[in-house]
Every structure is written in structure tokens, then in C-alpha cells.
Amino acid sequence: MEQSRAQYGRKGINMGNIIGDPFALATVSISMLAWIIAFISSIIATTQVTNDSGSFPPFAWWTVVYMSFVIAGVFVVVASDTAQTYHVALTGYLGAALALNSLTIHSLIYSANGARQAAGAGFILMAMVTIVWIFYFGSAPSAKPRAYLDSFALQKESHSRQMMYGGGRPETSTSVQPPQMYTSAQLNGFENPSPVQGISTTQARNSVVAPTFNATPPATKGPGQDQEVVPPTEYPYRAKAIYSYEANPDDANEISFSKHEILEVSDVSGRWWQARKETGETGIAPSNYLILL
């Protein structure tokens, strides 16, 4: 867990997050191309000022500058895999970008000048991509349209991961540390006093006082309690991570995982799923960060 958390902390801009995602690659590429068309056409239209056409609208230049920052922001957010963190702010900026593009299109598209019409076409393309981005980043990760778009990137990443590890690695991985060893150690403190009253309660309390706050199970546990932990948990389901997740350091049961990572899941009920990684590490993972295969 510490190793995975360290890898998560070192994660920065990764071009694989864009190249491996067809949706991100297509929309970012189209927006960049549209911005170049609008920028070059605006320069040409500025030099072609006539008495009939009038001066080039200065408002369009502000839209060009604003869209350059918006496109760069989307690129950085997607490449750094931080959409879950900044999707609210990004949606707000995209909403303002749509309004600016609409006003600029209205002031350019009806002109008889060819350069202005070309600039208007570039702004139209940027507006179309902006609408798609607003729908994508404004939707919850569990939304079917967004999950469908993310599934293309996940399948591509899954194929490359299987080729790298020889294929079928998650199916043959074994759990070295069953998660019940940690769960039962925490639950025994609550389960022992409940069915036993009177003298047995004091005996159980005395047996727990010495090993309190130890990471390993207490030495006074009977063999019957260890037998409950021995049977391994089966993981009939498989899931893929939509986003990266860093485990809470205060909760030893959580596990960290990276985006597009394949996990094995034992139970899909509730908000937290019992999962197992390819390395054999087990723990609980938030269900809204995973998608079932």
C-alpha cells in the first residue's frame, strides 16, 4: 500500500492518458485544430480591413485568448488524471467559453469577408467541442454515456496491460494477505462482549488490554477465531478503475489503485467493495471509482 501511495504521489502529466483515450484524443485534437484556424484567420481578417467590412471585432481576440487557456486546462486535467478533482471548476470555465464562442460567432459568421467566415468556422468547431466537454465533465462518473465513453479507453488499456503481463494475470493471482485478518481483528473487539455477559465480559476485556493498538492479532486469541480467517474469499467479479484512488492512511482496510487498473471484486453490494489487486493486495475500494466488466 505504501508503494502504491508513493507512485500515486509521483504521478504528473502522462501523455498516455490522452493517447490511450480515444475520446480525449479526438476532442483535444479537434479543439486545437479549431483554435489554430480561428487564430490564423483572425490575423488575416485584421489585416483585411475595408470600409464595407469595418474593423475586426476586438471581442474575438479575447475569445481566442480565453479558449487557449481552456484547451490547455482540459489537456492538463486529462493528462494528469485529475478530472474527478477539478471537474466542477472545469465545467464552469467551459460554460463561459460557450457563451464567448457564441457571441464571437454571431459577429463573424455573417460577414462577407472570407477570413472572418473562416475564423467563425473555427469558433463554431470550438463551441461544438465545448458542448461535448460540458456534458462529459458535468456528468457523474456513473452516468451511462460517460461510462460508455470511458469504456473505450479502459478496453484499450486492458489489452495493453494483458500483453505486458502475459494475459490472464488477474485470474491466477493469489491473495497473500486475506482481508479478513484485518477485518476480524477489528470486529472481534465488538463481537466478544455482545454474546457474553457478566464474568466472561471482564475476562475478554482483560485479555484485550495488553495488546491494544498492536497491528498484529492478539496472542490470546483462540484457535477458533483463526479458523474463521483461514478460508480465502472468492472474487467472482472483475472491475476496472475509472479514476485513481489513494487510500486513507487512517484506514488500514482501504487500498490504493491507479486509473484503468483491473481489480477482482468479491461483493458488489454497498458503496465499498471488497477488492483484490493483481499484486495480491486486498482491501476495500469505493464503488463509484470502479466499473464492472
UniProtKB/Swiss-Prot annotation:
Q: Record's InterPro entries?
A: SH3-like_dom_sf, SH3_domain, Sho1_SH3
What the entry lists under PANTHER family is as follows: FCH AND DOUBLE SH3 DOMAINS PROTEIN (PTHR15735), HIGH OSMOLARITY SIGNALING PROTEIN SHO1 (PTHR15735:SF20)
Query: What is one Gene Ontology biological process annotated in the Swiss-Prot or TrEMBL record?
Result: regulation of actin filament polymerization
Stretches that traverse the bilayer = 24-44, 59-79, 89-109, 118-138
Carries keyword Plastid?
A: no
Please indicate the ranges of residues that lie on the Cytoplasmic side: 1-23, 80-88, 139-293
Q: Name one GO cellular component term.
A: plasma membrane
The record describes the protein's role as: Plasma membrane osmosensor that activates the high osmolarity glycerol (HOG) MAPK signaling pathway in response to high osmolarity.
Which residues are in the SH3 domain?
Answer: 234-293
Assembly mode: Forms homooligomers.
Cite the Pfam families for this sequence.
Answer: SH3_1 (PF00018)
Topology, Extracellular side:
45-58, 110-117
Could you list this entry's UniProt keywords, alphabetically sorted.
Cell membrane, Glycoprotein, Membrane, SH3 domain, Stress response, Transmembrane, Transmembrane helix
Q: What is its main location?
A: membrane
What's this protein's name? Answer: High osmolarity signaling protein SHO1
Q: Which family does it belong to?
A: Belongs to the SHO1 family.
* Lineage: superkingdom: Eukaryota
Its localization reads:
Cell membrane
What is the organism of origin for this protein? Colletotrichum graminicola (strain M1.001 / M2 / FGSC 10212) (Maize anthracnose fungus)
Which residues are noted as glycosylation sites?
51
Report the membrane topology from the UniProt record: Multi-pass membrane protein
